[in-house]
Amino acid sequence: LLPNPSHLEAVSPVAAGKARARLQSLDPSGYLSWSGSGGQVVPGSCPVLAVQVHGDASFAAQGVIMETLALSKLPGFGVGGSVHLVVNNQIGFTTPARIGRSSPYVSDVMKMISAPVIHVNGDDPEV
């Protein structure tokens, strides 16, 4: 568990970096057992998983998310995937959603790396 400073989403690249460091510490020779060509970590093949929790407004509005996603496909930066839980808590209430982003969902930024996205209704967990 990593502490998040007052600057929203600043911990996102730190979490990815910590996962990457853990991968490297498990296999100092270059973690060849779960890397593909060019040193890119193959998704689903490594023993480390970064789990990150985000608020809706900060996930779509903070550029650090897009920067972290862009780095995830580079050799030397990939961690083989991470799980991002985006809570639609509407804490960023000072900006209405219709003018706070250019797409219907805050998770649409994940399309830049073709990551799968699952939308669920948190108000009715039994569904």
Q: PLM features: what roles do these ranges have?
A:
Residues 2-127:
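Glycine-rich ThDP/TPP pyrophosphate-binding loop and its adjacent helix/strand module
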